[in-house]
Amino acid sequence: MSSKNKVIQALETEQMGKDVPEFAPGDTVTVQVKVVEGNRERLQAFEGVVIGKRNRGLNSAFTVRKISHGVGVERTFQTYSPLVDSIEVKRRGDVRQAKLYYLRERSGKSARIKEKLAR
């Protein structure tokens, strides 16, 4: 059993009520993020490859990388954040590493990831 206080553990479990799809590094995902502009709120999509995932209960996070106008953009999202509206898995990537930081140095065809074929 973990050394966390039972009250803290109960609160964290309650806040982790959001249904998050199963995804892994190498997968291409679309994250819908709530953005507040002035007095209105809208959803902004961020689509890219998951290059890292951190599983720490309520403090879980994942990093998504995409190329926008020839510039690499990475964004780290807290999995259970209220600002993250939804996560949709577009395609499954077949990779052997947990952290795909090597993609930062690659561009073009060498940065492609094989698709995982369903069995």
UniProtKB/Swiss-Prot annotation:
Keywords: Ribonucleoprotein, Ribosomal protein. GO terms for biological process: translation. GO terms for cellular component: cytosolic large ribosomal subunit. One of its GO terms (molecular function) is structural constituent of ribosome. Coiled coil: none annotated. SUPFAM superfamilies: Translation proteins SH3-like domain (SSF50104). It comes from the Bacteria. InterPro entries: Ribosomal_bL19, Ribosomal_bL19_CS, Ribosomal_bL19_sf, Translation_prot_SH3-like_sf. This protein is located at the 30S-50S ribosomal subunit interface and may play a role in the structure and function of the aminoacyl-tRNA binding site. Belongs to the bacterial ribosomal protein bL19 family. This is Large ribosomal subunit protein bL19. It comes from Chromohalobacter salexigens (strain ATCC BAA-138 / DSM 3043 / CIP 106854 / NCIMB 13768 / 1H11).
